[in-house]
Protein backbone atom coordinates (compact mmCIF):
# COMPACT_ATOMS: atom_id res chain seq x y z
CA UNK A 1 0.00 0.00 0.00
CA UNK A 2 1.39 3.38 -1.00
CA UNK A 3 0.22 6.80 0.05
CA UNK A 4 -0.18 9.46 -2.62
CA UNK A 5 3.13 11.11 -1.68
CA UNK A 6 4.97 7.78 -1.65
CA UNK A 7 3.57 6.98 -5.08
CA UNK A 8 4.50 10.42 -6.46
CA UNK A 9 8.05 10.17 -5.10
CA UNK A 10 8.55 6.67 -6.49
CA UNK A 11 7.35 7.83 -9.89
CA UNK A 12 9.62 10.90 -9.79
CA UNK A 13 12.69 8.82 -8.87
CA UNK A 14 11.93 6.27 -11.57
CA UNK A 15 11.44 8.91 -14.27
CA UNK A 16 14.65 10.72 -13.30
CA UNK A 17 16.63 7.48 -13.38
CA UNK A 18 15.35 6.78 -16.88
CA UNK A 19 16.03 10.31 -18.11
CA UNK A 20 19.39 11.04 -16.49
CA UNK A 21 20.71 7.72 -15.26
CA UNK A 22 21.02 9.02 -11.70
CA UNK A 23 18.39 9.57 -9.01
CA UNK A 24 17.32 13.10 -8.07
CA UNK A 25 18.84 14.89 -5.11
CA UNK A 26 16.87 15.29 -1.90
CA UNK A 27 16.42 18.97 -2.71
CA UNK A 28 14.99 18.08 -6.12
CA UNK A 29 12.65 15.54 -4.53
CA UNK A 30 11.53 18.11 -1.97
CA UNK A 31 10.77 20.66 -4.67
CA UNK A 32 9.03 18.13 -6.91
CA UNK A 33 6.68 17.07 -4.11
CA UNK A 34 6.26 20.62 -2.79
CA UNK A 35 7.46 19.71 0.70
CA UNK A 36 8.89 22.23 3.12
CA UNK A 37 11.81 20.18 4.40
CA UNK A 38 14.01 17.26 3.44
CA UNK A 39 12.94 15.37 6.56
CA UNK A 40 9.67 14.55 4.82
CA UNK A 41 11.63 13.08 1.89
CA UNK A 42 13.69 10.97 4.31
CA UNK A 43 10.48 9.53 5.76
CA UNK A 44 9.06 8.77 2.31
CA UNK A 45 12.32 7.15 1.17
CA UNK A 46 12.37 4.99 4.30
CA UNK A 47 8.77 3.94 3.76
CA UNK A 48 9.43 3.00 0.13
CA UNK A 49 12.50 1.02 1.16
CA UNK A 50 10.60 -0.82 3.90
CA UNK A 51 7.89 -1.76 1.38
CA UNK A 52 10.46 -3.14 -1.03
CA UNK A 53 10.02 -0.58 -3.84
CA UNK A 54 13.51 0.93 -3.66
CA UNK A 55 16.94 0.12 -2.27
CA UNK A 56 19.56 2.54 -1.01
CA UNK A 57 23.07 1.47 -2.00
CA UNK A 58 25.64 1.83 0.79
CA UNK A 59 28.70 4.07 0.58
CA UNK A 60 27.46 5.90 -2.49
CA UNK A 61 25.99 9.39 -2.71
CA UNK A 62 22.53 9.74 -4.23
CA UNK A 63 22.44 5.97 -4.78
CA UNK A 64 18.84 4.78 -4.99
CA UNK A 65 17.73 1.81 -7.04
CA UNK A 66 14.11 1.18 -8.00
CA UNK A 67 13.45 -2.52 -7.36
CA UNK A 68 9.81 -2.71 -8.38
CA UNK A 69 6.89 -0.54 -9.38
CA UNK A 70 3.23 -0.67 -8.42
CA UNK A 71 1.21 -3.17 -10.36
CA UNK A 72 0.76 -1.17 -13.56
CA UNK A 73 4.01 0.77 -13.63
CA UNK A 74 4.21 4.36 -12.53
CA UNK A 75 5.41 6.23 -15.56
CA UNK A 76 2.76 5.10 -18.03
CA UNK A 77 5.40 4.60 -20.66
CA UNK A 78 5.52 0.85 -21.13
CA UNK A 79 3.26 -2.11 -21.43
CA UNK A 80 1.26 -3.00 -18.38
CA UNK A 81 1.41 -6.26 -16.58
CA UNK A 82 -2.26 -7.01 -16.96
CA UNK A 83 -3.91 -5.32 -19.86
CA UNK A 84 -4.48 -1.77 -18.63
CA UNK A 85 -2.12 1.13 -19.27
CA UNK A 86 -2.78 3.81 -16.67
CA UNK A 87 -2.66 6.77 -19.04
CA UNK A 88 -2.70 9.84 -16.83
CA UNK A 89 -3.75 13.35 -17.80
CA UNK A 90 -2.32 16.06 -15.57
CA UNK A 91 -4.97 18.63 -14.82
CA UNK A 92 -4.79 22.32 -15.70
CA UNK A 93 -1.32 23.24 -16.98
CA UNK A 94 0.19 19.76 -16.87
CA UNK A 95 1.23 17.75 -19.88
CA UNK A 96 -0.83 15.00 -21.39
CA UNK A 97 0.84 11.63 -21.16
CA UNK A 98 1.60 9.09 -22.41
CA UNK A 99 -0.45 8.62 -25.58
CA UNK A 100 -2.21 11.88 -26.35
CA UNK A 101 -1.15 13.87 -29.39
CA UNK A 102 0.74 17.01 -28.47
CA UNK A 103 0.39 20.12 -30.57
CA UNK A 104 -0.42 23.72 -29.81
CA UNK A 105 -2.65 24.35 -26.80
CA UNK A 106 -5.41 25.58 -29.08
CA UNK A 107 -5.19 22.58 -31.41
CA UNK A 108 -5.12 20.14 -28.51
CA UNK A 109 -8.14 21.79 -26.91
CA UNK A 110 -10.08 21.66 -30.17
CA UNK A 111 -9.48 17.92 -30.46
CA UNK A 112 -10.44 17.13 -26.89
CA UNK A 113 -13.62 15.27 -25.99
CA UNK A 114 -16.01 16.43 -23.25
CA UNK A 115 -16.52 13.47 -20.93
CA UNK A 116 -19.39 13.72 -18.40
CA UNK A 117 -18.56 13.26 -14.73
CA UNK A 118 -21.27 11.02 -13.28
CA UNK A 119 -20.36 11.07 -9.59
CA UNK A 120 -18.02 9.10 -7.35
CA UNK A 121 -16.78 5.52 -7.33
CA UNK A 122 -15.38 3.70 -4.32
CA UNK A 123 -11.90 2.25 -4.40
CA UNK A 124 -12.45 0.87 -0.95
CA UNK A 125 -15.71 -0.01 0.73
CA UNK A 126 -18.44 0.20 -1.92
CA UNK A 127 -20.51 3.36 -1.80
CA UNK A 128 -23.91 4.10 -3.23
CA UNK A 129 -23.75 4.57 -6.98
CA UNK A 130 -24.28 8.10 -8.21
CA UNK A 131 -25.75 8.55 -11.67
CA UNK A 132 -26.22 12.31 -11.79
CA UNK A 133 -24.15 14.19 -14.33
CA UNK A 134 -22.45 17.11 -12.59
CA UNK A 135 -19.99 18.54 -15.12
CA UNK A 136 -17.58 17.49 -17.86
CA UNK A 137 -13.82 17.15 -18.18
CA UNK A 138 -11.84 17.70 -21.37
CA UNK A 139 -10.00 14.55 -22.46
CA UNK A 140 -7.70 13.96 -25.46
CA UNK A 141 -9.37 11.49 -27.84
CA UNK A 142 -6.29 9.26 -27.83
CA UNK A 143 -7.09 8.45 -24.21
CA UNK A 144 -10.43 6.94 -25.19
CA UNK A 145 -11.45 3.94 -27.22
CA UNK A 146 -14.63 3.40 -29.18
CA UNK A 147 -18.09 3.75 -27.71
CA UNK A 148 -19.42 5.94 -24.91
CA UNK A 149 -17.36 7.10 -21.96
CA UNK A 150 -17.93 8.76 -18.61
CA UNK A 151 -15.82 9.73 -15.61
CA UNK A 152 -16.09 8.97 -11.90
CA UNK A 153 -14.15 10.51 -9.04
CA UNK A 154 -12.22 7.84 -7.12
CA UNK A 155 -12.76 7.66 -3.38
CA UNK A 156 -10.58 5.35 -1.29
CA UNK A 157 -7.23 3.60 -1.50
CA UNK A 158 -8.01 -0.02 -2.35
CA UNK A 159 -6.48 0.30 -5.85
CA UNK A 160 -3.30 2.22 -5.03
CA UNK A 161 -0.98 -0.61 -6.05
CA UNK A 162 -2.53 -0.36 -9.51
CA UNK A 163 -1.60 3.33 -9.64
CA UNK A 164 -5.17 4.49 -8.94
CA UNK A 165 -5.21 7.10 -6.19
CA UNK A 166 -7.85 8.74 -4.03
CA UNK A 167 -9.07 11.85 -5.86
CA UNK A 168 -8.21 10.59 -9.35
CA UNK A 169 -10.86 10.86 -12.04
CA UNK A 170 -11.42 7.40 -13.53
CA UNK A 171 -12.21 7.38 -17.26
CA UNK A 172 -14.69 4.59 -17.93
CA UNK A 173 -15.74 3.00 -21.21
CA UNK A 174 -19.37 1.91 -20.99
CA UNK A 175 -19.57 -1.86 -21.18
CA UNK A 176 -21.78 -4.53 -19.68
CA UNK A 177 -19.19 -7.30 -19.92
CA UNK A 178 -15.57 -7.73 -18.90
CA UNK A 179 -12.64 -10.06 -19.39
CA UNK A 180 -10.89 -11.55 -16.42
CA UNK A 181 -8.23 -9.13 -15.22
CA UNK A 182 -10.07 -5.99 -16.33
CA UNK A 183 -10.55 -3.16 -13.85
CA UNK A 184 -14.25 -2.44 -13.86
CA UNK A 185 -17.05 -0.43 -12.37
CA UNK A 186 -19.10 -3.11 -10.64
CA UNK A 187 -22.60 -2.44 -9.34
CA UNK A 188 -23.39 -4.76 -6.43
CA UNK A 189 -27.03 -5.59 -5.63
CA UNK A 190 -28.07 -2.60 -7.79
CA UNK A 191 -27.07 -0.32 -4.89
CA UNK A 192 -23.31 -0.10 -4.39
CA UNK A 193 -20.65 0.79 -6.93
CA UNK A 194 -17.00 -0.11 -6.60
CA UNK A 195 -13.86 0.00 -8.75
CA UNK A 196 -12.11 -3.37 -8.66
CA UNK A 197 -10.35 -5.96 -10.78
CA UNK A 198 -12.79 -8.47 -12.25
CA UNK A 199 -12.12 -12.21 -12.23
CA UNK A 200 -14.19 -15.33 -12.65
CA UNK A 201 -13.78 -18.04 -10.05
CA UNK A 202 -15.77 -21.04 -11.11
CA UNK A 203 -19.42 -20.02 -11.03
CA UNK A 204 -18.66 -16.92 -8.94
CA UNK A 205 -17.22 -13.46 -9.57
CA UNK A 206 -14.25 -12.12 -7.64
CA UNK A 207 -13.80 -8.37 -7.18
CA UNK A 208 -10.16 -7.91 -6.27
CA UNK A 209 -8.55 -4.84 -4.68
CA UNK A 210 -4.98 -3.76 -5.42
CA UNK A 211 -4.18 -3.21 -1.77
CA UNK A 212 -3.42 -6.00 0.69
CA UNK A 213 -5.35 -4.17 3.40
CA UNK A 214 -8.62 -5.06 1.64
CA UNK A 215 -10.25 -8.43 1.08
CA UNK A 216 -11.38 -9.95 -2.19
CA UNK A 217 -15.16 -10.08 -2.51
CA UNK A 218 -16.61 -13.29 -3.95
CA UNK A 219 -20.16 -12.89 -5.23
CA UNK A 220 -22.63 -14.81 -7.39
CA UNK A 221 -23.10 -13.36 -10.89
CA UNK A 222 -26.68 -12.31 -10.19
CA UNK A 223 -25.44 -9.82 -7.59
CA UNK A 224 -22.90 -8.09 -9.85
CA UNK A 225 -23.54 -5.93 -12.90
CA UNK A 226 -20.65 -4.53 -14.93
CA UNK A 227 -21.12 -0.88 -15.87
CA UNK A 228 -17.83 -0.15 -17.60
CA UNK A 229 -14.09 -0.71 -17.93
CA UNK A 230 -11.31 1.58 -16.80
CA UNK A 231 -9.39 3.09 -19.74
CA UNK A 232 -7.49 5.99 -18.16
CA UNK A 233 -7.03 8.41 -15.29
CA UNK A 234 -7.30 12.19 -15.00
CA UNK A 235 -5.20 13.56 -12.17
CA UNK A 236 -4.70 17.09 -10.85
CA UNK A 237 -1.30 18.06 -9.48
Swiss-Prot record:
Query: Taxonomically, which superkingdom?
Result: Bacteria
Subunit record text:
Homodimer.
Site (Cleavage) found at 123-124
Identify the coding gene. lexA
Q: What is its EC number?
A: 3.4.21.88
Tell whether Hydrolase is among the UniProt keywords.
Answer: yes
One GO-annotated biological process of the protein: SOS response
Molecular function GO labels: DNA binding; serine-type endopeptidase activity
Can you name this protein? Answer: LexA repressor
According to the UniProt record, what class of enzyme is this? Answer: hydrolase
In this entry, the residue ranges of the DNA-binding region are 26-46
